[in-house]
Amino acid sequence: MAIKKNGFIPSCDPEELKKVLKAVASEWGDMIKDMEEFDVVPLKGALTNEVFQINWPTKHGDLHQKVLVRVYGEGVEVFFNRDDEIRTFECMSKHGQGPRLLGRFPDGRIEEFIHARTLSAADLRDPEISSLIAAKLREFHNLDMPGPKDVLLWKRLRTWLSLSKKFCSPEAAKEFGLDILGDEISILEKELSQGYQEIGFCHNDLQYGNIMMDEETRVITLISNYA
């Protein structure tokens, strides 16, 4: 097992994670007797979380299983409700959008490992790839998600603005114009709420690090934490 200097995986409860990993392996018929059988590979691309590829030998010993462990970034809960995020993730998985949820532990979750490449900023300028992303995003927007169909945008913006004012220095608040953002949010809400408004399910964080593509099939997968 690849040990990092702070333990099994930093920033999380290693015993809880090992327990869940062993349970996942057991469901697939693999009996893990020694924790050294887990191989931990840090992955790049995530901005607010730490992600790791975890490998272990199958019961036949000639192949390896792979899962992705996502350790939540410190303090990101101020941006969204974690329970709501997990429910959304599970529902998206059932609709075939994104990886399957395999397990949870206090500091993160275990996901199906997607054999695809995380895109780069340069990829987004490729017309073919942009078209594939647009088609996938249309599927995403058309998902029939459970729960009330309420507009969350304005409440979220005001919450984030309040947090920004709380943690920013007076100099930073002035530089970013925080004092006028509240009025601008109200203007946008008024202008965009007139007439019939169709409420849809939105990604809210469509940057290249949250988009993956299978190089062979050209299938696009969207990773979402803020939908």
Where do the model's predicted regions map?
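Catalytic-loop of the protein kinase fold
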Residues: 201-203, 208
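ATP-binding pocket architecture of kinase catalytic cores
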Residues: 41-183, 187, 191-198, 216-217
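Activation of the activation-loop gatekeeper triad in protein kinase-fold domains
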Residues: 223-227
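Short, solvent-exposed secondary-structure boundary motifs
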Residues: 31-32, 89-93, 203
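Juxta-kinase regulatory segment immediately upstream of eukaryotic protein kinase catalytic domains
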Residues: 1-41
